Amino acid sequence: YLPSGIASITDRVAARHWGKALAIHELAPNTAFLLAPLMVEAALGVVEWRTGLMVLGFAALALAGIFKWRGWGADYCGEIPDRRVMAAIAAKPAAWLMMLSFGIGISGTLGLYSMLPLFLVSDHGMERQWANSLLAFSRVGSLAAAGFGGWAADRFGPRTTIRVVFLLSGLLIMGLGVLRGPGLIAAVFCQPVLAVCFFPAGFSLLSRISSRRSQNITIAVTIPMAFLIGGGIVPLFLGWMGDAGEFGRAIMLIGLATTLASSATLGLPGPEVDTPEGIA
């Protein structure tokens, strides 16, 4: 979905408003983080899990029909992933930096989200229900924060926004590893609010590093690899360190990596790259 979805938004919206438009787009995953567990818990009291999956599938089909009927998309066809296009993308340092940046961004949201309940229960002695509820409600603030992140990307530039988000989010992640009591709870609530501000700026910048026609391939290559890093390797690392009794230290290392990644943004394209045609 993402290659076509992001390309459709950036094609129909002026480049100076990409941050705000993509922030609206990012309301969807942030809302899902909050509502999906609550909806599943409520549905399981009425129907079995297979019925829930069927409803989800029918909803996806219905939305496809609605989009075909009333939706709009880009008025051009993207590139096919042939050797020429892939080589051109691989030759861009900015593409590799964006892959790393999205990996860091995803590790600060999905990666931590999947492992924090275990950390709170095993290292801080919280009840499982309390830990899950705390984590769910900590995502409420991220709904408004995504909009702020989009505004900041348009106002100060996506590169500056990403740098500040990584710096502050990394410090809060390190706080998760060392704080206890009220300080820990404050960090649990504040860190995701900052972390989600990355994505409007990240997608805005990712859409600028290649031509309009090859934008779909750039996104299709970058995001899966970033998910492998942030949603695969990082949770695996946290689990492995948790088994060794070093859960807190592992979270501190993730926070340190996030903070250091703020300096890597110096290699990303700056605000002068502001047209849909990108830099290649």
State what each model feature region is.
Residues 146-157, 242:
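Helix-to-loop junctions at the C-terminal end of transmembrane segments
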Residues 72-98:
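Juxtamembrane intracellular "pre-TM" segments in multi-pass secondary transporters
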Residues 25-68:
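Helix-loop-helix hairpin linking two adjacent transmembrane segments in secondary transporters
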Residues 159-202:
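C-terminal transmembrane helical hairpin of 12-TM major facilitator-type secondary transporters
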Residues 212-244:
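A late C-terminal transmembrane helix in Major Facilitator Superfamily
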Residues 58-76, 264-268:
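C-terminal membrane-cytosol helix-exit motif in multi-pass small-molecule transporters
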Residues 94-143:
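Extracytoplasmic gate region of multi-pass secondary transporters
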Residues 1-27:
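Cytoplasmic helix-loop-helix junction between adjacent transmembrane helices
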